[in-house]
Amino acid sequence: MDCIDKSIRRESLRKLGCLPDHGWNLFVQSSNRYSKLLEADSKLFKAQRIEDTVLSICEVTLENKASENALTLFQQLRFYLLNYLFLEDTSEYKSVLCSLDESVYPNLLPLTANICPCILKALLALVRQHRELSSDIVKFLNSIFLALTRILNTPHSSNNNPTHTKTTIFEKVFYASHLGFFFEEIADACISALPQDACLWAMEVCNTILVSDLPCKLIDLHNDSFLHHSNYYAGFGLSYYLYLSSMKAYINSSGCLWYEDATSFWDIVKHRPSSPEEKPFLTQFQSILNLSDKFLSKTGTLRLQEKLGTSCNLFFVLVLKLALLSSSYIGFVPYTYSDWINVLLGSISEDPELLPHLIELMASLACVFPTHFQFAMKRLRLIAIYAPRFDDGNVTYAQLASRKLAQLFNYSSRDTAITSIYQFANLLSPADTPDSYLAAPKERLSISDNMSSSSSQTATVNTISNYLNVIDSVREIALTVNDEKIYGLAISLLIQKFSRKFDSRVSTELVRTLADISTKANDRDFSILVQFYSIQNKMLVKNGDEALTIAICDSRCLIARGTESNSFKRSDLLKSLLEEIIHIGIVRDTPAPELKGYYFGMSKAVQALVECVAGTDWSSLPKEEMYPALFRDMWFTLVINRFRYSVDLGETLEVDLENIAKNSPLLVFEDFGSNFESNLELNTVLRTHIEHSVISQIKSELLVRVPNIDLKPLSTSEICFLSAVLLLESLRCKSNKLSALVEYLLDPSLRDSQLPQSIRAIALYNLTSFVESLSKERRVASSTIDEFQKLLCLCCNRVDCVRQLALECMNYIMETLPHLLGIKEILFSVLELSSLLWKARTEECTDQYVPQLLYKSNKLNLSVILSDIYSCREEVLFQFNRHARSWIQNSSKAIPYQVKNLLESYLADFVDFDDLEVVELGRSLAVELGTRIVSSDRDNFVLPAFGNWTPDTSSEFMAEYTIRQRYSHVDNSILNIEGDMSTDRIDLILNEKSKLFETHLAALKSLEDDILQGNTVSPQRLRNEVRKAAAHAVQEPIFQFSVLARKIVRIPFLDFSPSSFKLGITLWNWMMNQVPSFSSFLISNIIRNWKNEIVTEKRGYFSTAKSKSPLALPMTYSPTERASFLSYKNKVMSQMIPHLLLLQLIAGNFEGFWYGDRQTAKLIVHFMKFVLKKITSMEVNLNVLTRELHFKFVSFGLRIAENLLNSPLGSRFYNLCVDAGLCWFSGMPNWTYGADKLHVAAEISVMRSLRDKLDSFLLRYPLKVSTTLKQKLLIILLNNEMYMLYTWLTPVLHGRNVRMVEPIPDSDAASSPITLEMLQVAWNVSPNIVLYAPKRFQNAPLKQMALNFVIANPFTSVKHEVALEYLFEHYPSGEFPIDRKFILYWEPMYPVSGPVMFMPNVKWNPQLLQYTMRSMESYPVSVTFFYVPQIVQSLRYDSMGYAESFILETSGTSQLFAHQILWNMKANLYKDEAATVPDSIKPILDRVMDKMINSLSGEDKQFYEREFTFFNEVTSISGKLKPFIRKSKPEKKAKIDEEMKKIKLDVGVYLPSNPDGVIVGIDRKSGKPLQSHAKAPFMATFKIRKEKLVDADPEELAVNGTEEEAGDSAKKQTYEVWQSAIFKVGDDCRQDVLTLQLIAMFKNIFNSVGLDVYLFPYRVTATNPGCGVIDVLPNCISRDMLGREAVNGLYDYFRTKFGDEDSIAFQKARSNFVQSMAAYSVITYLLQFKDRHNGNIMIDDQGHILHIDFGFIFDIAPGGITFESAPFKLTTEMIAVMGGSNKSQPFQWFQELCVKAFLACRPYAHYICQAVEVMLDSGLPCFKGQLTITHCLERFALNLNERQASTFMLHLIEQSYANKRTLMYDQFQKATNGIPY
């Protein structure tokens, strides 16, 4: 072991001692072994092994050990200390040093001087750590001290033997030295807290030495032959050393006794020292003061100086510190302290080491005794100026003094610090100037009047040294005071004082000082400093001063390192450096002989830039500063100024340029501009004069390095650009970064230029050097792996040329370096990207119209942005998949085993239960290619193909993968019971199994509790715990298995999520395979839990909550929120999928149980019977999203029935299945929800399979007539449902459709086979089947049959609202051929239908009116609130007062409803806008309004008065503005602002158009007059506080429809928005109100089917005749305004605002445009919007198109001229945005969405018309009587089936496509009103 390095051996022992338990025991054994060796032979103490052991014990002691361990360490340290001091372990500790041979003396002291201090340090550490050992250790140390002093006090022997004399002298030197070490360690130990008894002991021993004359007795021992020059001697004599060390220990132990550590008294930053109120140690400190007075007396001073023969100034300074400490404790300071300080200050030239102590002394003196504050401040200031300096690089005395000075400023005003800064800065003037203060004689600046005459002699001051001191002082004061204003002042003054006349050392120090202060300064001062540096460096280019240039460079590097990346300061410095380099390069007019300074200055700026760009994130820098443009110009500057890659001068900076290149942005960006060539030509750098020789040289360099590049067609600017790209990217390639070159082609303007081929050539040139550099590396760095991942992502880029270049590069790399796919991250990236591309491609089938553009991998840091064009995605997938296969196959030939292992690892690392994706291309690719890798057994390949099968290695690959999987998930619970099976071994195994069983059971119980309590359970935890328990359960006997299995089955039901059920079903299947005998137990538990879930929890399909019609939900005036219905879909699907998975599990195992375990099979049969009865009794939620599950239940029931048909149970079970199938059709025919084509295809597939099975049953089995009729009807209904869904799946047959299902023939839409007998049996199953059958088929006889059933069975029909609809359709007068009493109990009609019941065509019928009132009252106010206009119009026909009663009652419950009613009534009082022609309804409205107002009282009345007063104040501004109509806009604006200031804002008031918010603020400067010839409309902005639901249950909202009923889980969050509103006077807004009301209804309808269209029904409220409030659409601009801004067209606007067509922003905006365009187009046709000029069409900041101003709808057009004959506006510019032609994918989306929107709203056509019908007599000009309703219904094409309706809508699109009449109207508007198009 002696051969082991001593440091390694010592560190090993130390680490062993720091280990617990066994490691500590080994350490103790080793220590004891060496101590025994030392006892046996004392000569061994010199061995290095013993020394290492002792030092390791000391180091272990410094760790905080347990008490028993500390005692062992103390014993060891005690033993070794006695041995190294050569003291006998007796009571007197006698020395045995004299017994040693004299020859060992020279080497003895160095050895002990190294070890003994370490032992003392360790012992004192034990005193600090273990108070229980403190007294014993202190007692031992005191004994050592007494022994040493006794030996040193022993007089010299009179023996004249020289050998004996020499030995005696050595002994005294030895022990005197160690006594000094003793005090040194005490002083160091007191820096940290020591116990009081230890401190008191230390003070006692120090006092003993200082009081005695022991040090003076050792004066004669100055024998250099014995003295070891240790750092402990510090260059002093042994006697003086003892004085100094004991005094230092005295000071520290006294400070520790007072403050618990020795430094606190002198650290005036932490606290201000002061005399304590309680003085428990007064005696001790009084004795200290007496001792110090003795030393400081004139007698004591002279005596000590005479004995030691030196001035002893350092000792007296320490005595003075001790005296100050004691007097501070006592609270009295003698005046002699200041005298002593002055005396000592006079000696600093002789003893400069006094200064640190004097500085510390004066600072504490000033703090403790304020009378000495100015005295200390003055002297500290002078020290800061005149203190000597040394070139050792340490902190200067001036810095120490100024630092303490600054700390004292904390105890005075900040003005003191400012004054001092000014005083110091004013001393900075060059020596040759008149105001050079520091060049004056020193007597002007004498430190004290008491200084000796020698110090006052005239002498020339070292001006440079003093300047440097002043600069240091300014820096220290600024940094220590830590005040923003002080920083700014220091920077400002130092910049002002900067002069080139200073010595270079002063200038450079000033520059560096500014850098130290800068990072703490505010941004403004920092910017000033940065500009100062830049200006100076630019000046130095011509007037070279290399030292100053280097200082500026170093300073800027320091600033860059001291600021955070992307902070303002770093960014400011970065900008300054870039601008400086560019400026130097552009304005250079330096003569050739002076080029050296120019290049030197630029190179130093480049070096500073290196530090500045490190870690910079360009995306977060402020875009307005144009950092990429500055970098681009900087590289251009370097290129044209010979800093090129091939020039020697550039190579001198190659490392710096490489670091800049590594973090430099590309020279082009996507927002670079529309024309690349023109941008280059206009570039600031490139348009300067460039010498022809430079251009020629650049060309030749490019051609030499990139031979394939063609420079002939390129301009000078383009050539310089390519040279800059070559320089930048060649340097970047040295850092293994290649992808940047490919990214250049992402810039659209560059792609349109002549440069792409040149960029490609440069990329291929750099590719070879990149590969060569990479091949030389032994290990691929993580940054290089990141680069490969980036390059792989570019191989999937949406831009073709980018993708092709990236693939070309990757192909070359993979061919040259195939081993790269042996790196896990790279191979996994290839596979992950394949999966991402596949997922992106399949999105056409899952979320077609709003495709996800950004795809990220959860496993790796990968992301790709793809086009929204699916054909492009398909091309990307095809190319990448083809190349990926090639890369992996090529690598598998070079490194087959690595690739195979990695492929297996990829498959093994798959997180299988977090994602329900069933197809992952990456995994499939791994399996496919892994099975093709050459086998290790090559003999297999010589076998012929037997049985038409060629041998391959797939079995080997899968075997290896299986083994890997088996052993990678081995659970610790699987115990090895093989081998020794003795009794003890068996007992051990059983005991361990029992413990594991309890552990897993407890873990499962904890999971259960957490789920039941609603605590968050991570999927990882659930997966791990359940897996481990399942692995253990299959090894247990039946009892333990059953206990664990119950938990394993129950937990997924408690969690009830798709991922938990996928996990559970996988484990249940595995457990049944592992232990087949327990299968029935598991299935029975699954069924029991499932049945309990259905009965108690009722989630998903078995929920009792029924989704409401969109007409029964609140209508909102807000934009479409796609997130809300996506959230609803996800919630429903998450609760439906578990049932689907469970059904698949049960159905998949049924056949096996039927033939193997009939009892379990019967259990399944009984469960299915239970489920089917639930369905037939309508105890399920027939949501459109549950269609697949519903018919899968029925299909599985038929499978069971087929096995039971031969039994009595079979016929009944089969009949139950058919009834369950029919029950799906007991509701309104519904489309699907969302754009998931896969889901629709799955539904069609399930229904087709069910239909085929029913057809088979008809042919194979004789059934009852009733069953056969029901079965035939079910087949007809299934055909119709499939036809309807197929139409939805393929709305545009001629377009791009993914073939997912077989086409459904048109014949399936017919209803001719339905007979009365079928309807009769169906009625017995559920009347709704019959009642909703006419809704599915365009068949009048079928509707008549349904009506007959209603008339014949009114009692049964009252539960179904649709039955009343048929009655009204055939008997519109309301005279039904049934008993009127049934009407009272009928299911409530929709609120939109209520007001229609009061119209004259419905004859007076009290029962019908009572039913109407009950229906209206059954809905919450939030629903009826929407129909205020219709409710008010119903008063026109309310002869019995029912409508009036409803208004009054509802107004009493909702003040907001009452206010809206009042405003609407006021708006309907007159027929004209001027309020001159009363409406016939006016008396009724007046009466009702009076009743409503008179009924108000209390808070309701106050609220009414506040609201209407406030609103009247706002609207009155229009009246006051009328005299200003013909005046200028500024005058109008001033008047509005004047009136706005007068408005009083009361609590709770709101805008009529925003009743769901409260006004909390008014922008009183926001008033804006609007254009009008004779009216005075204006716009104003208000701050509105609203509430929104947070974490609301989306399913509950869809069911209940109101926020009030959204459940307890919903939380309301308050938020504020600024809303602008237009206040109109003289314009009838009622028609806009109606139109936007209808648009809101359409929005609800579209949302009900999850249709990806967009509408924004903004709010308009009519408040008086010709008056109203209109909400302003936020963030919108009219197409008219775009035209006035000289925008060529919408497409150009989209490109300008959102970027190139390939950009993500453009594609998102285009998608938004398509969605909104489709919705508004359909509504425009249905409601006949006219006057659609560009002033009435808006574009918002997200690309949506919006319509406003609905003055011409239904049957009227502007001026009666029918210019706009097209169904809707679809101009060429709109088509251009949507792809440019009717063949493009976005336009096909538009077509499909139009068709789907049309299909979705057709079932609600009558209700939409009812909302209009009740308004016919309102006097609105858009109506032509009942003809309006007739025409409106005709536009819905209700006589057509679904496919015919889709064709009809496509024909309308074709008619509108670039219609000439639309263009003519736009031209007409431009000619007449100046509206551009």
From Swiss-Prot:
Superkingdom per UniProt: Eukaryota
Cited InterPro entries: ARM-type_fold, Kinase-like_dom_sf, PI3/4_kinase_cat_dom, PI3/4_kinase_cat_sf, PI3/4_kinase_CS, PI3K_accessory_dom, PI3K_accessory_sf, PI4K_N
Region: Pleckstrin homology (PH) domain conferring phosphoinositide binding specificity, residue numbers: 1492-1625
Annotated stretches, region: Activation loop: 1747-1771
GO-annotated biological processes: phosphatidylinositol 4-phosphate biosynthetic process; phosphatidylinositol phosphate biosynthetic process; phosphatidylinositol-mediated signaling
Residue span of region G-loop: 1599-1605
Catalytic activity annotation: a 1,2-diacyl-sn-glycero-3-phospho-(1D-myo-inositol) + ATP = a 1,2-diacyl-sn-glycero-3-phospho-(1D-myo-inositol 4-phosphate) + ADP + H(+)
Protein's UniProt keywords contain Membrane: no
Subcellular location, record wording: Cytoplasm
GO MF annotation terms: 1-phosphatidylinositol 4-kinase activity; ATP binding
Region ranges (Catalytic loop): 1728-1736
Residue span, PI3K/PI4K catalytic domain: 1593-1861
Major enzyme class: transferase
Assigned keywords, A-Z: ATP-binding, Cytoplasm, Kinase, Nucleotide-binding, Transferase
Residues of the PIK helical domain: 1305-1491
Any Gene Ontology CC annotation: mitochondrion
E.C. number(s) listed in UniProt: 2.7.1.67
Family, as annotated: Belongs to the PI3/PI4-kinase family. Type III PI4K subfamily.
Function: Acts on phosphatidylinositol (PI) in the first committed step in the production of the second messenger inositol 1,4,5,-trisphosphate.
Name used for this protein in its record: Phosphatidylinositol 4-kinase stt4
Organism: Schizosaccharomyces pombe (strain 972 / ATCC 24843) (Fission yeast)
